[in-house]
Amino acid sequence: MDGDGVQEGGRQFSWSGQGPGEVAIAGPALDMRMLSNGEASLLLNYRLDEKPSGLTRLAIGCGPGCSGTLDLTPTLSQATPGEWRSVKVKLSCFRDAGADVSRVSEPFVLNTSGRLRLSLTTVQLSSDPAGAICPPR
């Protein structure tokens, strides 16, 4: 898939609405306390291909039963389908929503039970606070 001006630069994810599903990045636990105390954020470059039909959550996972989960539905619902956009979510918002940022094992989790089709080119940490948001829980 070509994404954001880069050939084969993105991945498309689809949820059918037939039950819960998620996409995540997982690895060894990281201590992100310093990042969450500062102005760091999680940056997503995305194209909405089909608007969400249900609650869509963005989370940071910190082990079994541990996460900080935010409602990304309003942000995605405002996007124009087919248009590339960026969103930055403050790491402190995930901490305030319950994530133990001293042991982050999933720095990106996106889940929904509804229909959704979304393409991503970038999922990364950003130190630039400009435009960063804190979605509702």
Where are these predicted regions, by residue range?
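Internal, hydrophobic beta-strand segments that form the core of beta-sheet-rich folds
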Residues: 104-114
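Extracellular ligand-binding interfaces
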Residues: 13-97, 114-131
